[in-house]
Amino acid sequence: MSADDLWGSNELATLDEVREAQAALKTYDDVLRTPQLNDWPVGGKKISLKLESLQTTGSFKLRGMRYKLHRSDVEQLRSAGVVTLSAGNAGRAVSYLGQATGYSAKVFMPASAPDDRKVMMESMGATVVKVPGEKLLDAVAECIQQEQRVLVHPFDDVDIIRGHASCGLEILEDAPDADVVVVCCGGGGLLAGVAAAVKLSGSKARVVGVEPEGAQSMALSVASGKAEWCPDGGKTSTIAHGLAPPFAGRACFNHVKAFVDEVVTVTDDEMRVATRALFRAGVVAEVSGAAAVAAMLAGKLGDVDGKKVVCTVSGRNIEVDEYEHALSERPMEH
């Protein structure tokens, strides 16, 4: 197996598959139907907030990853376990799933990731291996070849996308009159899933993806017509670490191309403003989790006066010092 084998397939999720995923996830107590605060006052605007920040493990990631395990071979899971690559929410979710299921979990993370994240994942029983960022994909591919582990990709897998689509179905259940659905985008798994659910359900809502200016692989992909890496070999520059993979997923991009109306970008300062506005509205969010709200508050969505706008709040996992900086007016050092 090579690193190129880790990319997702070209197939698109169907409505039946999305509904099947939602039904399957309802059988797991740890996959929560998260609250949606409709027409909530945030930063002087009325915004409907889909609080994936209240999902088990603190982010939306558990939806897709739980469904990936549901669809995987049980004997392989028992004998070999799972593997992922992540320094953040995906690694946290896979570590949790290893603990919850008893399957062996291994997480490869960039050598630059903070040690406390490694310790946190290890506390849940995961084996965590730090490698240089440019060698992550090769390390995971070698691990799969040698240990036969099931790959739980952080975003680029159609089963992951189908699982995340359950979030989109819930959004429509709670706001069938939504005019605009706004979703943060890193590799694109959540955006792909929510957009597929919204469009396949027949909703006329406009779906908008939001990326940091310093990590806009999906916007570059939309412009070029194929999944792209960030410039200079995948370099990113943003405080929104959860939205800064070096590349857009191929399976994710195929769904974005089919179901997303527009991808916009926001600055780090705009995400900090949104994080503060959410805090004042009673919602704790990591900076990445505030990106969709940032697009709304910064006027990146066009004329939405009088329209029902639903924004995902994708996660709450943030270090204390990062949160203090986000809530302050002081410039944040990169």
Enumerate the predicted regions with their spans.
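PLP-dependent amino-acid enzyme catalytic core
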Residues: 1-334
